[in-house]
Amino acid sequence: MTVNRLLLLILPAAIMVAAMILTSGMEHRLAALGTTVQAKLMLGRAGLALPYIVAAAIGVIALFATNGSANIKAAGLSVLGGGAAVIIVAIAREIIRLNGISSHVPAGQSVLAYCDPATMVGAAAALFSGIFGLRVALKGNAAFATGGPRRIGGKRAVHGETDWMKMQEAAKLFPDTGGIVIGERYRVDRDSVAAMPFRADEKQSWGAGGKVPLLCFNGSFGSSHGIVFAGSGGFKTTSVTLPTALKWSSGLVVLDPSSEVAPMISEHRRQAGRKVIVLDPTASGVGFNALDWIGRHGNTKEEDIVAVATWIMTDNPRTASARDDFFRASAMQLLTALIADVCLSGHTEGEDQTLRQVRANLSEPEPKLRARLTKIYEGSESDFVKENVAVFVNMTPETFSGVYANAVKETHWLSYPNYAGLVSGDSFSTGDLADGRTDIFIALDLKVLEAHPGLARVVIGSLLNAIYNRNGNVKGRTLFLLDEVARLGYLRILETARDAGRKYGITLTMIFQSLGQMREAYGGRDATSKWFESASWISFSAINDPDTADYISKRCGDTTVEVDQTNRSTGMKGSSRSRSKQLSRRPLILPHEVLRMRGDEQIVFTSGNPPLRCGRAIWFRRDDMSASVGENRFQPENKA
């Protein structure tokens, strides 16, 4: 217990009791001030009630003085205790007085009929002060009335009457039995700590967070996909990734750029009977063959080979120059030809049909590679391979050099043994993900994602296609929980999963830092409309961008408020004043109010429902989650 909290717990009650004691006996002094019998009697009665009224007033003043404090609940308890002490003293004094006159009460009358009205008034004042203290002790700062314009509903709401979703409706829409954690079922802006900022290391700032039921999504409506926008340091991992990884009960793929989720969650998932795989470049011996799914479950090998080539070659949703577009398209065709040669020509053993072998073939000296392409064209058993190689056989050396340089650049990451091992290994198969009991954590840090996005694109694309190609023949749904997804760049398979993934057992939860990241990765402002149209829920929190705040304000809608207006006019004959009430339009939440939201508060949008303003499920505030989470490598000394 801090010193401030201890002082607030003791001082108000002590001052209330002291004031009551010090003002006792004032009835004689006040009565002496009267000049008539009636005045002396009235002042004497007031003096009897004065000690208790003064104590009650001090309690109320103390509560208003501590309004906005993090320890206001302690002050409320103190005022409650002080009010109770004052009432007990008043009752005790009155009992003693009545006991003294009980022998003189006429027969047939109750001694209670002689209770002093002044003392009763004073005790009532102390009672109401104690009730107010109890309210503050329970609700904190939320016990005080909040100022704001009066909202109008019904026929008079000419400018709109949008409102926040009620928590009862939110509980029906997002029951706590779901697997994807959305947030917590309470209004942060109405909590006792709403006036102070959220601090992870100050439990006093948490308020009701961590003690209320969860809001979870069970995929019952919409596409089942979700999008999260939260700024840097906005508790994305602690409020979305970790809680969802704890609750999700089916197949799970997590892109973990911080490499902290897997160590904290793996043991919990294993205890639930799940197979946990961590794809970490620093750990040798763990990897899968990114080409093992090609041609399975009814799809043609040629289509799948082209898909792999598009993942390696970073797609660009924006129009590039004709020259750049030619070399990139030709480089992708060269990669397609080399992958097809490894998989279809028939001269490569099954265990060697990997991307590592493709890179080995590509990294030969340019003249030797041209000779290999000629040999492939002449001896391949696949017409598809021949058709893709044919264009390079008689290509001019200068043009081929440009194509070769592009292909080598895009596959450069396959030269690193640890990166190549992740997509050319045999410790597990992509088919393992379809059984619904396999979890894969992709522990690629931001440096790797920035320098070699093709690595993560190949991993995620292979796992997505391994599920997609099964045409829904999977156990349960597989959740792809992708943090820092903008680092992957434009990935067409994600758009395919977005539009048709629900039917094939794929659920996406994608985490961005801002709208700008999404627009940069997926092609300007049109990207937001495409993704928002296909998302079941969209969450915004920890917003620092004014453009994003303006978008949220507009999407929340408008309300009609009643505004008091006063007009003053001054003339030669005097002045006049008139008052009127007007109906005006006001956004449900203004952009600057969005920017001022606490870090543990979010706004969630769903189709066909009012906007939801609720808390965030930060794992270290919840005892049920803290007990299941392992040590955080960034905070080894403290779990929280």
UniProtKB/Swiss-Prot annotation:
<keyword id="KW-1133">Transmembrane helix</keyword>
<feature type="transmembrane region" description="Helical">
    <location>
        <begin position="440"/>
        <end position="460"/>
    </location>
</feature>
<dbReference type="InterPro" id="IPR003688">
    <property type="entry name" value="TraG/VirD4"/>
</dbReference>
<feature type="transmembrane region" description="Helical">
    <location>
        <begin position="118"/>
        <end position="138"/>
    </location>
</feature>
<dbReference type="InterPro" id="IPR051539">
    <property type="entry name" value="T4SS-coupling_protein"/>
</dbReference>
<protein>
    <recommendedName>
        <fullName>Conjugal transfer protein TraG</fullName>
    </recommendedName>
</protein>
<feature type="compositionally biased region" description="Polar residues">
    <location>
        <begin position="562"/>
        <end position="573"/>
    </location>
</feature>
<dbReference type="GO" id="GO:0005886">
    <property type="term" value="C:plasma membrane"/>
</dbReference>
<feature type="region of interest" description="Disordered">
    <location>
        <begin position="562"/>
        <end position="583"/>
    </location>
</feature>
<feature type="transmembrane region" description="Helical">
    <location>
        <begin position="72"/>
        <end position="92"/>
    </location>
</feature>
<feature type="transmembrane region" description="Helical">
    <location>
        <begin position="212"/>
        <end position="232"/>
    </location>
</feature>
<keyword id="KW-0184">Conjugation</keyword>
<dbReference type="InterPro" id="IPR014135">
    <property type="entry name" value="Ti-typ_conjug_TS_TraG-like"/>
</dbReference>
<dbReference type="InterPro" id="IPR027417">
    <property type="entry name" value="P-loop_NTPase"/>
</dbReference>
<feature type="transmembrane region" description="Helical">
    <location>
        <begin position="6"/>
        <end position="26"/>
    </location>
</feature>
<comment type="similarity">
    <text>Belongs to the VirD4/TraG family.</text>
</comment>
<keyword id="KW-0472">Membrane</keyword>
<keyword id="KW-0614">Plasmid</keyword>
<keyword id="KW-1003">Cell membrane</keyword>
<feature type="transmembrane region" description="Helical">
    <location>
        <begin position="46"/>
        <end position="66"/>
    </location>
</feature>
<dbReference type="Pfam" id="PF02534">
    <property type="entry name" value="T4SS-DNA_transf"/>
</dbReference>
<keyword id="KW-0812">Transmembrane</keyword>
